[in-house]
Amino acid sequence: MAGHSKWATTKHKKAANDAKRGKEFAKLIKNIEVAARTGGGDPSANPTLQDAITKAKKSSVPNDNIERARKRGSGEEAGGANWETIMYEGYGPNGVAMLIECLTDNRNRATTDVRTAMNKNGGNMADAGSVSYLFTRKGVAVLDKGENTEDDILLAVLDAGAEEVNDLGEKFEVVCESSDINAVRDALKEAEIDYDSIELDFRASMEVPADATTAKKVFNLIDALEDSDDVQNVFTNMNVSEDVLAELDSE
């Protein structure tokens, strides 16, 4: 199990201040707006939009904010920005490979923010293609355990193309090929298994174990990157063991 995945599911516990929470809300709202613009404003006919709305609701984003974002994206209301997805590549402390996914209406600002965060936190930018080949696009669903066992989840999604089910502590994670994400979503719904989120992700083909010192430096860099309003996601090839995670949590 990739330690970064578990860290990501518990990260909201560490986002205690209002500024962090506000940034998280802004990223979720942006996802809704882009999904509505790309696939239309009707969630029942646009699974990506429905998933973005579900994730926002699970994160306690107010319904009014969600609805306004949907309308901006679909063109029902004015004010939608011209969002552009940009993927930056680089290396973090101790050579950890990183992909930084931005959703921005200002490419120059995004580039400056990412470069500044990398330079100040032991990272460096890399040429396009020099890091991305280490990662594969995957579909990833995250769900509360509830009464379900790992076998229950696997049984529900295996025929839909799921490759693995990972135990993240309080939650399960289902990983599939990116082309199978719709089938896995449908399988979860058919089995009446509620999920927090289901979206496309990047997973490292080979992960590199990290000790507590390296992990702490990389997580600090990720925090600095995610402080930028333009950064939506950060992916790494770092694997953090349960022992190292426990050591970091105790600090």
From Swiss-Prot:
Coiled coil: none annotated. InterPro entries: Integrase-like_N, TACO1_YebC-like_2nd/3rd_dom, TACO1_YebC_N, Transcrip_reg_TACO1-like, Transcrip_reg_TACO1-like_dom3, YebC-like. It is found in: Cytoplasm. Its main location: cytoplasm. The keyword Transcription applies. Keywords: Cytoplasm, DNA-binding, Transcription, Transcription regulation. Residues 1-22 are annotated as: Disordered. The keyword Ribosomal protein does not apply. One of its GO terms (cellular component) is cytosol. GO terms for molecular function: DNA binding. GO terms for biological process: regulation of DNA-templated transcription. HAMAP family: Transcrip_reg_TACO1. NCBIfam families: PRK00110.1 (NF001030), PRK12378.1 (NF009044), YebC/PmpR family DNA-binding transcriptional regulator (TIGR01033). Belongs to the TACO1 family. This is Probable transcriptional regulatory protein jk1057.
